[in-house]
Amino acid sequence: MDAAYRHMCTAYLRTRSVECDVLEEPARAVVDWAENLCSNWFLADANACWTSAAQGEWADCGYIDGPARQDEFYWHVLPTFVGSAKTTVVIVSDALRYEVARDVAALLERERGGNVRVSSMQAVFPSITEVGMPALLPHQALELAADGSFVLADGMPTATTPQREAVLTHVEPTARALRSSAYLNMAGVERKALLKDSRLVYLYHNKIDTTGEKAATQDDVFDACADTVEELAALARRVCTDAPGARVVMTADHGFIYTRRELNECQMLGKPDLPFLDAPVMHGKRHLVVPNEAVAKLSVEACGVFVNVDMGRLGAGFEGFAPRENVHFKRPGGTNNYVHGGMSLQELCVPVIGFWRARSGSKDFVDTRAATLRVLSEGRRVTNSLFSVNLIQEEPAQGKVLPCEYELVFTDASGNEVSDTVKAHANKTSVNSQERVVHAKFALHAADGFSAKGPYYLVCRERETGKIVWRETYTIAVSFAPVADFGF
């Protein structure tokens, strides 16, 4: 649903740049309907169910027992993706939501010999950069500063890239940390030397969050998601080209919620609802962290507005609160359409994607192949000059099965074309075979007649290369064909 909403918004914004007055109002009406469905039903009800199921464990320990945890990424999650690789590159993309990461994985799965593994983990509350980035580093303990301005990993600061590299080198002396742009700006020789000399490299990428966090650009966040998909796939390919045996692991510090329409006033909590706002340690549109002693000021009625989150993973002395569903804390400035920091699935579920390339001939190597079509109709006899042939795309165009465009045409035994040429796309991704049926309409060429004895063939060829993939034998029992073009 999140992915469908994102793609719908992106498509709608594209239509606004095309002059078509007839479609403008109907398109707006459809988008408004979908907006109401997403905001008032999906986000509200799905996260109400999620909160109801999880709030007890959040209050007790701050996380759900069972799913992988972001604060255990380095010691418990990362090793399961590394295998025997000598070099591991961790790409951390700020605000890479899980459903966006699935698009990255789908793109990488189309690589020859590319192997992709997709998993997820739960982010640490509050789901913000200042907490998520330290959680992804090696540590025994995280500690929130008394004023909430930074998080320490085993007593070491983590706010900047050099500081994160210092934390990494504390456990892996050859480790490096740098921005993805800095890595790509290196000369090829420098990149290869870096990966050869380092067993562990953290690359930091930031496209989604830097777009969404600004009021002037927050409505471009879904375009930023599309750019991020392409950039991360290209970055992973580059790493595996620079170091063929490397393992790439992509993850994020947090996700986000975005809605085209701003919230109503009733969906925002102000100071009357928050009697302890005089002393917040951390405060955002979707999260609140206060000293333990401030919690006593909260009434029983107000407690029902929030989800209580144990903050033990960030040290003692703090209590966390997140608004339920898609409610925001009212704060001046910032953005209202793009937010994160809370406990919704969209904010809390972060991806973990493993990618590596297998050498040709190895047991892990899987080559790509084109999606194929075959004739579904049992009959092989044509009795009308205007007719249809039903075909089926044999596999969904997913992973190593790539979309392909074909040309279909009827020929005689000498290879002369006796029908028009029909384009057929094998690009359907549905796992339901009935949704992969292709209907091809043909019109026979004008002629004196067709021989019922002579064989005719339905020929399928790749449109790009002209290579014949298959041909099926048919009988054409039509005494004449029309001389006029009826538009088929």
Task: List each language-model region with its residue ranges.
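Feature captures the catalytic ectodomains and active-site-proximal regions of enzymes
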Residues: 1-488
